Amino acid sequence: MTDLNLPSIFVPLVGLVFPAIAMASLSLHVQKNKIV
């Protein structure tokens, strides 16, 4: 069972991937509206 190892992988993954997606979508939104 990998249930014990899952949080140790899932938490850093969300902690790194989610902000990266948020920053990427934010930068695309700013470029699309040309708000500098």
From Swiss-Prot:
Location(s), subcellular: Plastid, Chloroplast thylakoid membrane
**A GO term from the CC aspect:** photosystem I
- Identify the stretch annotated as signal peptide in this record: none
UniProt xrefs under Pfam families: PSI_8 (PF00796)
Q: Which SUPFAM superfamilies match?
A: Subunit VIII of photosystem I reaction centre, PsaI (SSF81540)
Q: How does it sit in the membrane?
A: Single-pass membrane protein
Q: Which UniProt keywords apply?
A: Chloroplast, Membrane, Photosynthesis, Photosystem I, Plastid, Thylakoid, Transmembrane, Transmembrane helix
Q: Which InterPro entries match?
A: PSI_PsaI, PSI_PsaI_sf
Q: Which GO BP terms sit in this record?
A: photosynthesis
Q: Which residues cross the membrane?
A: 6-26
Protein family according to the UniProt entry? Belongs to the PsaI family.
Query: What role does this protein play?
Result: May help in the organization of the PsaL subunit.
Q: What is this protein called?
A: Photosystem I reaction center subunit VIII
The organism's lineage is: Eukaryota, Viridiplantae, Streptophyta, Embryophyta, Tracheophyta
